[in-house]
Structures are given as structure tokens and as C-alpha cells.
Amino acid sequence: MFGLGGQELVLILLIVLLLFGAQKLPELAKGLGKGMKEFKRAQNEIEEEFNKSMDDNPKKEKATTASKS
């Protein structure tokens, strides 16, 4: 994960604990989780919209070709 080992992750967690305190950590984790969830939801929506437009595109081309014949 990002080229970090176990010792580096523990050190980062200790620094975060010192900076924000034990009281704020659950709030920070909750906010981070919500942000990641929202990002994934938006990413999925964009992907679905892209796939839908790609699926509709050949149908439009076939309809245009058929009407020209």
C-alpha cells in the first residue's frame, strides 16, 4: 500500500493521534469513510453514464444507416 511498511504506518498513526487526540480520531475516520463512499458512488455513476452512452451510440448509427437505405 503506497510502498509503506508496517513501521511507517504505525508511526503515521501515532503522529495523527498526537496531533488530533483520541477524541477526534473517530470523527476523522467517519468523515474519511463518508468521503470515500461518496467518491466511489460518483465514480460508479460516471462509469454507468459512459457505458450507457457507448451502448446507445451504435443503435443511433444503425438507425441512421437504415433510414438512408
From Swiss-Prot:
Keyword presence, Cell inner membrane: yes
One BP annotation, GO: protein transport by the Tat complex
Gene3D superfamilies: 1.20.5.3310
Pfam families: TatA_B_E
The UniProt record lists the keyword Transport: yes
Domain of life: Bacteria
Gene Ontology CC annotation, any one: TAT protein transport complex
Membrane topology recorded in Swiss-Prot or TrEMBL: Single-pass membrane protein
Keyword annotations: Cell inner membrane, Cell membrane, Membrane, Protein transport, Translocation, Transmembrane, Transmembrane helix, Transport
Region feature Disordered, mapped onto this chain: 47-69
A molecular function GO annotation: protein transmembrane transporter activity
Compartments it resides in: Cell inner membrane
Residues spanning the membrane: 1-21
Biased composition (Basic and acidic residues): 47-63
Record-stated family: Belongs to the TatA/E family.
Quaternary context: Forms a complex with TatC.
Reported function: Part of the twin-arginine translocation (Tat) system that transports large folded proteins containing a characteristic twin-arginine motif in their signal peptide across membranes. TatA could form the protein-conducting channel of the Tat system.
Matching NCBIfam families: tatAE
Name by which UniProt lists this protein: Sec-independent protein translocase protein TatA
Organism: Chlorobium chlorochromatii (strain CaD3)
